[in-house]
């Protein structure tokens, strides 16, 4: 994105999701997307959409984003989320205070292929540290290479590149610099510019190597000798000191220019002086954004005259924090998940800026948009949750609820007046635990994967037929044991023919078909219980090129035998993928023995599908239950909290859809859908493709018991005349 800013590119594209494998879900894809967009990407190119994943294609930088994945039916919602990000963040002007010199010349100057050098390690590790740390202390920046910096304009005490203006030039530890870069740095300082450097200063030029002029210029600029600080840091590192010393050496000129150098006895990556760097930057420039949580990331853009802040929580836990903005206006929260726009009612106006308390769930993201509207009544402080605020002339009506029992208060500001209202003790929510056993429906068919085989070479090709190797009564226990995969993993040369044989038990249910996938060779034949099966069949729902073969009339109760004869042409051939058996059954493991058993009509919430007979199922299971809710009144707010869901949740109450959650939090407002009396609840849960495609027993389903959380809504109404004046009121 820095290059796009400096070369004038209107869009920044990034190909994403290749290599995140078949257990990828929307939560992980959202995390990656948010990370990219908060760093300046505004056009997503998802990888990839395979027409077919049959055979080795499923291993070519997976996953497919296409119909093979159970989440495909919800993909439009994810695409709409990304579209909203792109719409909000495309175009406009990026706001950053810091210009960060990219230290590639110094890295090459100190790089030795045969070994790592001390100076190269400092340059590399401190570059990575500064890159991450600046994001965490919320000083946004652009990288700049020396050619771009050479051509940049100096306007007053700022550096201008295309449409970007920068207050501070940051020099990471460097040893080597172009002469033109050195001249630009001097001119910037002499024009009142601010420069922050650390640990190392240049003593070489790219043109000459060791360069006395470079040493003199940087010694005059920062008041320290570049050769001395280089020798000292190398000596300190070699002594392996456990205690570090660090200080800032500050130089200023009459035009307001600042040249600050951080001198230390260890690299920045070892000391991690984020507070010191934040303090020094704050002396040089006014922070555009301050957030009291280093885990929260922020991108600021100005578009159509409006300040837009993209706020991201890349951690998995809910975070409460305060967002302090130098800009001023009426804040709105724009939700890219559903496209809603709501006024933010809780904030403070301080020092001509805005302070906003916010909460973001794990992997959450929101836009804060500042609108230049007239002063509105707003809440400056409260310990209860504000549901909504309605304004009618000189009157406001606040609807709120207590998330826990408390002595409630709410402080309201309107123009130059403020009023703090004490509401007394409010009760917390009522929790309604839902049943642990639910009825269920499985969409499609359950799966059982056979990945363990007994294998024997048949160099005569016909010997296996003559001796009946494919028959149930033939004992294959002495054969070679192996898993699916190319023959190169087990053989030095391809045999003329190879028999695969495996056994499985059926105790009930209905076995309907098998899927033939990754059976590679010049020819192959399939046998079930000694009877050859016609391998021609229709395309399966899993993939257009994976054949579906009906075996419903070949399978019997008790032990069943499957045998496959493959004639490979090379070591790349063989049985590359598990054989997938589909039908209406559950997979049961008892005393290390696996059987296919009859389905029951109940499923337990709080336990994975993999523990309840569906270890290889990928798709959707519908949980169904009914609950009684007496005397449900209009002054209630009811949330359905499903806790830990893997991976997509769709909620239907009384036959009406209430919402879909592609990622956490799996909480949905069901207030309008519930009624007094009997209520029917359906939870449609969809997992990933890893279970059926890779045979991975990825936890799926409702992994914690759902519950209803019922809050009492309270109404606070007051007019402008109810306020009391306060002198010198900042807010």
Could you say what each language-model-derived stretch is?
Residues 479, 496, 504-530, 562-564, ...:
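Aromatic-lined ligand-binding clefts that engage carbohydrates, nucleic acids, or primary amines
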Residues 1-473, 477-481, 487-513, 531-541, ...:
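Carbohydrate-binding surfaces of carbohydrate-active enzymes
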Residues 558, 670-677:
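Glycine-centered tight-turn motifs at strand-turn-strand junctions
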Residues 349-353, 542-548, 661-668:
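Short, solvent-exposed loop/turn segments in extracellular or other extracytoplasmic domains
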Residues 533-539, 656-663:
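Long, low-complexity serine/threonine/glycine- and acidic-rich segments characteristic of extracellular
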Residues 571-595, 693-731:
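Exposed low-complexity, polar/acidic, P/S/T/G-rich flexible segments that act as propeptides
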Residues 548-554, 668-671, 694:
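Signal that preferentially marks extracellular ectodomain short beta-strand elements
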């Amino acid at each position: 994105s820095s290059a796009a800013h400096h070369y004038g590119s209107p869009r920044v594209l990034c190909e994403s999701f290749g290599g995140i494998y078949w257990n990828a879900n929307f939560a992980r894809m959202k995390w990656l997307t948010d990370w990219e967009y908060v760093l300046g990407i505004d056009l997503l190119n998802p990888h990839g959409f395979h027409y077919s994943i049959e055979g080795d294609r499923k291993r070519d930088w997976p996953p497919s984003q296409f119909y093979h994945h159970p989440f495909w039916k919800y993909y439009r919602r994810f695409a709409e989320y990304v579209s909203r990000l792109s719409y909000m963040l495309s175009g406009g002007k990026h706001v950053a205070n810091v210009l960060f010199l990219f230290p590639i010349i110094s890295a090459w100057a100190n790089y030795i292929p045969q070994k790592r050098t001390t100076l190269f390690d400092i340059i590399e590790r401190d570059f990575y540290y500064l890159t991450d740390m600046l994001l965490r202390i919320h000083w946004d920046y652009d990288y700049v290479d020396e050619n771009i910096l050479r051509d940049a304009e100096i306007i007053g005490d700022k550096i201008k590149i295309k449409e970007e203006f920068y207050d501070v030039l940051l020099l990471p530890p460097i040893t080597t610099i172009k002469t033109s870069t050195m001249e630009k740095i001097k001119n910037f300082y002499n024009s009142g510019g601010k420069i922050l450097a650390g640990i190392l200063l240049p003593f070489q030029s790219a043109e000459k190597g060791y360069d006395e002029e470079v040493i003199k210029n940087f010694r005059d600029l920062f008041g320290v000798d570049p050769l001395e600080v280089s020798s000292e840091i190398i000596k300190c590192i070699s002594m392996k000191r456990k205690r570090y010393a660090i200080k800032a050496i500050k130089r200023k000129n009459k035009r307001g220019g600042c040249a600050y150098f951080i001198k230390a006895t260890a690299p920045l990556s070892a000391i991690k002086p984020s507070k010191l760097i934040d303090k020094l930057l704050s002396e040089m420039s006014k922070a555009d954004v301050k957030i009291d949580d280093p885990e929260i990331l922020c991108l600021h853009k100005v578009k159509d005259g409006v300040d837009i802040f993209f706020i991201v929580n890349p951690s998995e836990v809910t975070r409460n924090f305060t967002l302090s903005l130098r800009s001023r206006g009426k804040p709105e929260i724009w939700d890219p998940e559903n496209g809603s726009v709501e006024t933010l009612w809780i904030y403070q106006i301080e020092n001509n800026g805005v302070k906003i308390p916010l909460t973001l769930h794990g992997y959450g993201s929101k836009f804060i948009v500042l609108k230049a509207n007239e002063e509105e009544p707003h809440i400056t402080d409260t310990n209860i949750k504000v549901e909504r605020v309605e304004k009618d002339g000189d009157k406001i009506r606040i609807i709120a609820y207590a998330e826990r029992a408390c002595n409630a208060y709410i402080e309201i500001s309107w123009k130059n007046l403020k009023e703090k209202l004490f509401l007394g003790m409010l009760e917390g929510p009522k929790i309604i635990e839902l049943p642990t056993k639910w009825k269920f429906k499985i969409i499609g068919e359950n799966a059982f994967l056979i990945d363990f085989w007994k294998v024997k070479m048949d160099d005569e090709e016909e010997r296996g037929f003559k001796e009946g190797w494919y028959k149930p009564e033939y004992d294959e226990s002495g054969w070679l044991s192996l898993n699916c995969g190319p023959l190169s993993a087990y053989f030095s040369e391809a045999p003329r023919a190879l028999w695969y044989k495996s056994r499985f038990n059926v105790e009930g249910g209905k076995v309907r078909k098998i899927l033939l996938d990754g059976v590679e060779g010049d020819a192959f034949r399939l046998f079930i219980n000694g009877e050859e099966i016609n391998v021609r069949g229709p395309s399966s729902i899993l993939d257009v090129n994976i054949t579906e073969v009906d075996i419903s009339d070949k399978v019997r109760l008790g032990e069943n035998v499957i045998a496959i004869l493959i004639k490979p042409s090379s070591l790349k051939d063989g049985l590359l993928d598990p054989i997938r058996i589909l039908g209406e059954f559950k997979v049961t493991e008892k005393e290390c023995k696996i059987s296919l058993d009859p389905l029951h009509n109940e499923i337990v919430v709080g336990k994975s599908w993999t523990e309840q007979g569906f270890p290889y199922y990928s798709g959707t299971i519908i949980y169904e239950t009914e609950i009684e809710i007496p005397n449900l009144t209009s002054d209630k707010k009811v949330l359905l909290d499903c806790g830990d869901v893997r991976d997509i949740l769709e909620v239907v109450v009384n036959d009406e859809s209430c919402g879909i959650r592609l990622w956490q939090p799996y909480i949905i407002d069901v207030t309008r859908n519930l009624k007094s009396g009997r209520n029917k609840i359906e939870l449609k849960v969809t997992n990933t493709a890893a279970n059926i495609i890779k045979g991975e027993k990825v936890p799926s389903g409702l992994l914690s018991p759902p519950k209803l959380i019922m809050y009492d809504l309270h109404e606070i109404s007051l007019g402008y005349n109810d306020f009391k004046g306060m002198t010198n009121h900042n807010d």
